[in-house]
Amino acid sequence: MDLSNHISLFDTKATALTSCTSIPLDGERDDSLGLAGAIYRRAQENPSAPAIEFDGETISYAQLHCRAALLAKQLTRKGVSREEAIGIMTGTGFEQIVAQAAVVYAGCTCCALDPTLPFAQLQYRLTNAGARICLVDQENSNRLKEFEVIAIRLEGITPSQVTAELAVPPRAMGTEHRTHLMHTSGSTGKPKTVQIQARALLHLSRDDRNVPIGYEDRTAQMAMVSFDISLFEIWVTLLRGATIVPVSRTLLSDVARLARTWRELRVTVMLVPASLLPMVVFAMPTVFSGMQVVYSGGEMPNLPAMKMALEQGPPNHLFNCYGPTECCIFSLVHEVTLKDTKNSVCPLTRLISDTRIEILDPSGQPVPDGDSGELFIGGDGVSPGYVNLADKTAERFVTTRQYPALPSGCNFYATGDLVRRTGTGEIYVHGRIDNQVKIRGYRVELEGVEAAIMDTGLVTTTAACKVQRGDDDLGAALVAFVIPKNPNTFTPDQLTDALKVQVAEYLVPQVEVCTEMPLNGHTKIDRERLVREFLEAATKRQLEMAGTQDASTTISRLRKIWHSVLPGCSRHIEDGDTFHALGGTSLQAAMLLIRMKREFSVELTAVMVYEQFTLAQMARYVDEGGAKYTIHAAHNRAYRQDVDIYKSLALQPLSGQPPQWDGPFEGRIFMTGATGFVGAFLLQTLLTLPEVKMVVCLVRAKNDEKARNRVMGVQTQYNLCQSSVDYSKLVAVAGDLDSPTLGLGGELFHQLGYWASCIFHSGAHVNYAQPYQSHRDANVLGTANILRFQATGRPKRLFYLSTLNIYGPTGLVDGYTRVGENDPITKFMDAVQYDNGYAQSKWVAEKMVIDAIRDNFPISIFRPGAIFCHSKTGTGNGTDFVARLMASCMRLKHYPTMPQQSKNFVPVDYLVDAILHLSRQQCSLGQAYNVVPTLHEQPENEMRDMFHMLEKACQTPMKEMPYDKWLELLKTLDDNNDPLRPLLPMLEEKVFENHCRWEMYSKMPIYGTENLTRDLRDVPGLAQFPVLDQPLLNRFLSELNLI
């Protein structure tokens, strides 16, 4: 066969890179009917052949055609137009596939949706696509009420119906029919909606060499239907006449069970993401044995896993694949051989069907072999562009008009990927041109990591690199090479701790200290040399340590395993190291579980690996045969492990009634959080009260003197040092919330337990960029220790400051429109998963407090909204999120659209007065109070109202803009002092699909205030809740010198 017409850039030389046209399985094909015609043809030629098999039942090709045609008629009766987007939302099973076929038959466009998406995401995708009609199964029938819903019904059809429908060919739509809308998982902003035409799927399905799938094959369908991999699983399978076997995605959490399920279902075709491949292979090395073809892609190929599969249970074909969504699934592939894995190389050597590629330099000229350039992909697989993104489409989907070096008559997609072609035509992918890399499933901007490192002021030079060892089974590590500003005093932990405050956990790198940076011939930092020398040094150190130890001991074998799954750990692992302290992630922990089970035949939990055991403890656990160990935890939701932590405290309430703290012989207050914003105002108010004899403040400090200095510094900061405040009643003691005796020592701990009349606990660690584990000690263990203190000495009441964040983004996630003060907190356990580590820690802490209330501990809970400035003076916290947001938006002269989002502002003086009043009342015992505006006063769009008032206050026009565009504008500010800069991780880190944590709070519910309203109804100054208005905002901005 002459391949010259199918090889771009390789016309004049012999090349390993080849493109393959298909050898038709069933003679000449007529494409005028498009995808629907392919199903129709299968149904006519082999009507009884199984098209879908699920849960013991089968739908044949004839039945699939009939069901699709009948459902398509329903759509037609609704007056649908050509290529109109139709939403599809179903669970695993027949319905999704029947619905997609029906939409194609009707000449429309499938907009398939993952049911696990929050409603706002579903609504955005449907609205952006212009959808008005949605096909749903029974389980999702009530979730899309704003759209016209058609239920997918799969009741039995008669043979006569099948015969009748087989006589009628489907509507002819041709190859240009836009059949699908896919969504990218971009690292910033909302997902881009990519248009897919019938020709793209036909062009892939007809490549017999690279798609060796026949009538007898069975393809597992388990990808999210909004991603392009699902198109292969569904449509390429149908176009090849094979059988689709739907498999539940819930099995992804148990790879061993998943592997067994594939075998039980006789799956012969699999598409396995590169990040999942090693997990499956190491769980069951023979999992692919007997399969026809396995495709793996999405990240760099995992050659050790491929090697194991090829050695112990190879499929007939194992492909490494590359292709962006914009080019419909795959564009370049390579059939992996054992020789490839042993040589540790895996290039791309084949083009899919009529795919064409060009490699251009930044000026748009072709690069010579051996040089790197940007990859451009052309051919029938290329999308027409994005939906409602004309500028982005024009930028990425190009022709010879924009790039004269590109061949004419063909549209190309500019991938943004850096590749190199060898003299023999092999293609190697080197990553993103913009230096964005993928590390353990996260997209990481290396320049962004470097900027965060430089912002700490601890280093003079840095280079962040993706490091991957040849024997690493998990993927890459993020390593930062640094030259310290003060080499004699610098430690890597200093930099790590500083970064944990600024960036998301996955952006905190392993730190490697250098005395100088190597430079390449272009006088730039030689990153390749840095990585090479780092790996060489790590290997040398490990070999040296291995030579001094008995390799047969459990701890030596275990240390070797730890090293193999921690590619960023170049130093010797000590006996006392924990997996978490070494930077181990949940994915690496899961791999360690598999490795240890295979090596030692013991069962461990991820919590033990990731957070609990040192290397020596784990070795001892193995030597003891694996004692039974269970913990209530979800694998990758750290806060859930503590849901029942209260039981472990084994506390008993003290007998007798607690005193009125303001009684004539009382007035002795123990409080935490005096250096915080609320605590400072609470302390000042307490010290003005004649009934208060003394206030002991627990403060994190080296000694009592420094503790008092911290407290007084905060009082001065907020202008609270007034003549009416008696600071002689203040006693500051150095302590630590996360210590069982609060850092006081046993004797003083017990003395204060008898001394205190009550406890005000407002101390907490608050950092919106840090994960749960960073907040656990202070917020969870700290609250546990306060409960211990309450149970020590004599009875006393505890007044606990919680937060509205314990509800999480429940409006968006759970669909609740109203939540009550007395609602079970467990209702919101799933929603808080999508909030930050602070919110998760406060949820766990309040759950613990509620459990204590059930045990008759005398406690009251206060959940304020966003704590704002003092209502009279305007004194506020200039470093909290709202203050930073206001200041930054004023500088940008733009603010983001945040639909149905409110902060439920509460002035700090109102909050303090309400807490103190309720603390004196018996009716508040055991109660929880949502300290927010009452039901009829809670604004629906308080954020937008606030921005409007801000515009008036600064007397400068401010424009509203979509959140993603506002975020991009914010990031363009070349100013390290911008107040929102430290919080950028929270603003852009995607929690679920493309929703950041702040966006998750759209569609906020109404917060019930029945308890608050009832108990403050007749209290002067408190019965009427103050709301944010223009005068109050002006006072606040004036105090901060913003106006």
Swiss-Prot record:
Keywords: Alkaloid metabolism, Oxidoreductase, Phosphopantetheine, Phosphoprotein. NRP synthetases are composed of discrete domains (adenylation (A), thiolation (T) or peptidyl carrier protein (PCP) and condensation (C) domains) which when grouped together are referred to as a single module. Each module is responsible for the recognition (via the A domain) and incorporation of a single amino acid into the growing peptide product. Thus, an NRP synthetase is generally composed of one or more modules and can terminate in a thioesterase domain (TE) that releases the newly synthesized peptide from the enzyme. Residues 549-626 form the Carrier domain. Residues 672-915 form the Thioester reductase (TE) domain. The lineage of its organism: Eukaryota, Fungi, Dikarya, Ascomycota, Pezizomycotina. It catalyses: L-valine + ATP + NADPH + H(+) = L-valinal + AMP + diphosphate + NADP(+); L-tryptophan + ATP + NADPH + H(+) = L-tryptophanal + AMP + diphosphate + NADP(+). The gene is cpsA. It comes from Aspergillus campestris (strain IBT 28561). Its cofactor is pantetheine 4'-phosphate. InterPro entries: ACP-like_sf, AMP-bd_C_sf, AMP-binding_CS, AMP-dep_synth/lig_dom, Far_NAD-bd, NAD(P)-bd_dom_sf, PP-bd_ACP, Thioester_reductase-like_dom. This is Non-canonical nonribosomal peptide synthetase cpsA. SUPFAM superfamilies: Acetyl-CoA synthetase-like, ACP-like, NAD(P)-binding Rossmann-fold domains. Pfam families: AMP-binding, NAD_binding_4, PP-binding. Belongs to the NRP synthetase family. Non-canonical nonribosomal peptide synthetase; part of the gene cluster that mediates the biosynthesis of campesine G, a dimeric indole piperazine alkaloid that shows good insecticidal activity Galleria mellonella. CpsA catalyzes the first steps of the pathway by producing L-tryptophanal and L-valinal from their respective amino-acids. These products condensate spontaneously to form trypyl-valyl pyrazine also known as didehydrocampesine A. The NmrA-like family domain-containing oxidoreductase cpsB is the next enzyme in cps pathway and reduces the unstable didehydrocampesine A to campesine A. One of its GO terms (molecular function) is ligase activity. Campesine G features good insecticidal activity against the global honeybee pest Galleria mellonella, which supports its future application in the development of biopesticides. It comes from the Eukaryota. One of its GO terms (biological process) is alkaloid metabolic process. Residues 671-914 are annotated as: Short-chain dehydrogenase/reductase (R) domain. Pathway: Alkaloid biosynthesis. The modification O-(pantetheine 4'-phosphoryl)serine is found at S586. Its EC number is 1.2.1.-. The keyword Oxidoreductase applies. The keyword Coiled coil does not apply. Residues 41-386 are annotated as: Adenylation (A) domain.
